[in-house]
Amino acid sequence: MLGELTKKEIEDVLMSNVVGRIGCSSQQKIYVVPVTYAYDGESIIGHTVEGMKIDFLRENPECCFQIDDIKNLFDWVSVIAWGTFEELKGEEAARCSDLLMKRISPIVSAGASQPHRMGPLPTARQATFEKNPIIYRIRIKEKSGRFERR
């Protein structure tokens, strides 16, 4: 059976996952990239370094965020949220960074710290991240969710 998720089910999917995908666009290109995240009940919180994703989001802050939980072809849920990207600074960045670290620390300590199967970050990238992390949020304006169950 195909169906739409309730508001509570959408919130549960957002709260219970730590890996999603940001979809953003710049001029004639669309870019979708997996990221680790935390959900604070209103916004998606993430961190990154300079690169294509940040370039696109700075140019066009309107974006979407997608999360799914797929058990098999006939048992899955998917949530899409649309919102506006914001870079965070100062105390707000520190607060959101703490929230993000608390949410993703279980996967890091469980040895699953590379959810994107990238392997360890190259030394130069890791050094850049530690020195100049970009903390951001996506302020959600709209959410939708679907499921299939048999």
Regions inferred by a protein language model and the residue ranges of each:
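Short, basic/aromatic recognition patches
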Residues: M1-R21
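Short beta-strand segments
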Residues: N17-V49, F65-Q66
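Solvent-exposed residues in well-ordered beta-strands and their adjoining turns
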Residues: D40, V49, D68, E86-L88, ...
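Short acidic (Asp/Glu) patches
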Residues: T48-G51, N60-D68, H116-T123
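Helix-adjacent hinge/juxtasegments
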Residues: K53-N60, C64-E86
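Charged, gly/pro-rich active-site loop segments
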Residues: V77-R150
